[in-house]
From Swiss-Prot:
Name of the protein this chain belongs to: Neuropeptide S
Entry function: Modulates arousal and anxiety. May play an important anorexigenic role. Binds to its receptor NPSR1 with nanomolar affinity to increase intracellular calcium concentrations.
Locations listed in the record: Secreted
Origin: domain of life: Eukaryota
Residue span(s) of the pro-peptide: 24-67
Source organism (scientific name): Bos taurus
Location, primary (coarse class): secreted
Keyword Signal appears in the UniProt entry: yes
Signal peptide location: 1-23
GO biological process, one term: neuropeptide signaling pathway
Gene responsible for this protein: NPS
Top-level taxonomy: Eukaryota, Metazoa, Chordata, Craniata, Vertebrata
């Protein structure tokens, strides 16, 4: 269980920091004569990075995990009735 928590934490950090590595081209000194690629890559990058842009593919998964549970007598409350509450009502 601890191993899966570590894996989930590392995966979360990787995904949350991924936006920092987007649109950072290799400097032109490392690639001599390839300055055109440098300019094209800079022009294709958005000027303002939004944190949610990179995480759009996770939206359906997050919505499923955050969805409230509903029950017969407590629709939308997200609370599960215990046997004591059932016997009482």
């Amino acid at each position: 269980m601890i191993g899966s928590l570590k894996f989930n934490f590392i995966l979360f950090l990787l995904i949350s920091t991924m936006h920092m590595f987007w649109c950072h081209p290799i400097s032109s000194s490392k690639v001599p004569g390839k300055s055109d690629y440098f300019v094209i890559l800079l022009n294709s990058c958005p000027t303002r990075m939004d944190r949610r842009v990179g995480l759009d593919f996770l939206k359906p998964i997050l919505e499923k995990t955050l969805m409230k549970r509903s029950f017969r007598n407590g629709v939308g409350t997200g609370m599960k009735k215990t046997s004591f509450r059932r016997a009482k009502s």
